[in-house]
């Protein structure tokens, strides 16, 4: 949220208002340095203030990251999906968070560096199964760094695919 970002910037010692943060984000979007996604599940008023932001280039994002691996992975997926689906691309957050949701393609996508940890595996797959209960989703996908498998859970199929293979297919 804008307030959260204002608080983060304020911790650096800079005095900045929420309105200034909103202006800067609008300028950055207007100059194509990054783009935003709306929460598909949000009410109309919240769609403006509750967005996720992605850099248009992973090189720019890499300048600001301390631990870049997962963020870079999610950002490259966002860039690729944005090119393909443009304004049809959303994220979904309502009791669960799904990284990317494309209602017209009936596709829900999670991005995770690895599913080797059981807690991560459960979080990512449960979110996909939950969105499939409330939305018309036919394809459930987890994009990872280098893992590949098909998970059968609750009568649904979740495809796990490495980023390199997914990028070649899109």
Can you annotate each of these PLM segments?
Residues 93, 135-154:
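Nucleic-acid nuclease catalytic cores
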Residues 146-170:
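Domain-level recognition of nuclease-like catalytic cores that cleave nucleotide substrates
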Residues 121-134:
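Short, charged, amphipathic alpha-helix that recurs within catalytic cores of restriction-modification
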Residues 105, 111-120:
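Short beta-strand-loop-alpha-helix junction that forms the active-site gateway
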Residues 98, 117-120, 149-153:
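Short active-site-adjacent structural elements
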Residues 84, 134-135:
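Alpha-helix C-cap/termination motif
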Residues 1-108:
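Accessory nucleic acid-recognition modules appended to NTPase machines
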Residues 54, 109, 141-143, 159-161:
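Hydrophobic/aromatic beta-strand patches that form the interior of the parallel beta-sheet core
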């Amino acid at each position: 949220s804008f307030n959260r970002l204002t608080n983060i910037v304020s911790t650096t010692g800079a005095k900045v208002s929420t309105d200034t943060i909103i202006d800067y984000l609008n300028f950055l979007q207007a100059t194509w340095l990054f783009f935003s996604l709306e929460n598909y599940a949000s009410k109309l008023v919240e769609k403006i203030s509750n967005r996720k932001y992605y850099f248009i280039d992973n090189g720019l994002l890499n300048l600001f990251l301390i631990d870049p691996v997962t963020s870079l992975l999610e950002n490259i997926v966002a860039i690729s999906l944005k090119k393909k689906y443009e304004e049809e691309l959303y994220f979904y957050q309502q009791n669960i968070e799904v990284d990317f949701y494309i209602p017209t393609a009936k596709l829900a996508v999670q991005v995770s560096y690895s599913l080797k940890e059981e807690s991560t595996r459960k979080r990512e797959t449960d979110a996909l199964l939950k969105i499939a209960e409330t939305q018309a989703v036919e394809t459930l996908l987890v994009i990872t760094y280098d893992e590949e498998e098909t998970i059968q859970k609750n009568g649904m199929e979740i495809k796990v695919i490495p980023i390199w293979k997914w990028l070649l297919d899109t």
